[in-house]
Amino acid sequence: MKPMLFAILLATAAPALADTLYTNANGYTLDAKGTLQRFATLVVADSGPQQGRVKATLKAGAALPAGTRIDMQGATLWPGLIDAHGHVMRLGELKLVVNLRDTASIAEAQARIKAGIPAVGWIMGRGWNQERWYENGKLVGRFPTAAELDAVTGDRPAAMSRVDGHALWVNNAAMTAAGITKDTPDPDGGQIIRDAAGNPSGVFVDKAMALVARAIPADDDARLDLVLTKSLETMAEVGLTGAHDAGMDKDTWDRYVRFAKAGKLTARIYAMAGGPENRKAIAPNGPIPWSINDLVAMQAMKLVSDGALGSRGAYLIAPYEDMPSTRGLEILKPEQLKSLVTDASRDGFQVNVHAIGDQANRSTMDAFAAVPPAERIARRHRNEHAQIVDMADLGRFASLNVIASMQPTHATSDKGMAEARLGEARLKGAYAWQQIKTSGAQLALGSDFPVEPPDPMFGIHAAVTRQSRDGLPAGGWRPWEKLSMLDAFAGFTTWAARAGHAEAKVGTLEPGKWADFITLERDPFTAPPGDLWKIKVTATWLGGKQVFKRK
């Protein structure tokens, strides 16, 4: 028999190896009861109707089935991590504009802007935070001005988004392009920061940002595809196999679907339509369940009830401690919020409301209370951020079956500013993860990327230690609100999966679920808590396919 014919007959006669076995792993997953389970081998189906899904996890010493074996050499293996609140396109955009994150002074921000000026078009940037700027050893604290931006941009229009996306710093050329003058009124739910003479000084807060944004040229398809690609690369690098996109439009949804169909979407996206208009444009016939190999879903609508604490847009019950002339910005009036929530809920959608200030949180919970109880349970409505909650309202998360979607690194980044803005009394219900969990409510954890870095190990570190990455303060900030390592792990896996109506598909490595998993360079369950943020993901798999490997 000729060698080639023999090889063909042998290949035909021998059964194909239908599974891949990831052996010698230091594996962790939760089970359906939330109990931590350990395993040494992960079995993934490579063909048939279960292709890309988990077939089994096996303890050390268990008999191994037939299949292709990959020795993990003792690497720690976790389910893929899920960020319950991020901004996918903004994350990729940060790679393509001037990055002002971590600038320590106005001068440093100016230097970065000057170095990053593109050849043509508007000069765009993101990430500044006046609460991190110092001059001569003193906190600047004030907003930057158009004149300070003019100094490095000249007559080219420039717009720099604050780190939280709730304020825009622009130069005079940008205001001219947008037709902004002294006579331009503040819009409802927004504020134009002005000088002593009443002239716009260069910063636009919350809904006032739209006055300038309308003049910024739209990106073309090629650039937006690049933005999404950059975001997906970043997510895979930090072990995110899923993200809940907190507010997007139809164009973005269509882009996700196109990428998913082309096999280019390397993370599962649970999309929240940005407001009622986008909800109706994307899903006129009702929620879109998980589809295209469970890569995309659009079952939720995002609403914004107030602004952010850093720009004093968070809407408070009482005035700000450090600026008694304001209580913040009420972006949606209570009756308007209630109407939007109940209408979308009636149409079958989960409603996820951004609420930071205690008054915004109260109004948000009042709106959820207007939804019939059985409907609330089915929809799994969410309070996004739940950052400053009056003590009288903390128990309402559990009683109303509202998920608290919270971001641990917000607490560790905001701690000093929060003390100045709020005072001690209001801090009792601020960033209150443990109190909300102990009340019987469900949490879901995320980062709010790119407001905070997307690395979920940063979030797990913040949840467990209540410290910033420099180890401060000793013992943690308001340490009674710390979460256990197990809860932090659940927050970025099973809790986040349930918050996206995906607990039957992802979040654990149980049989039948997608084989979304990661390996890490160290075991977070045995590492010192202060080192958690340093642990790097070494590889990421989505549906059994490797989408990232650290070099």
PLM segments and residue spans:
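Sec-dependent signal peptide recognition
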Residues: 1-7
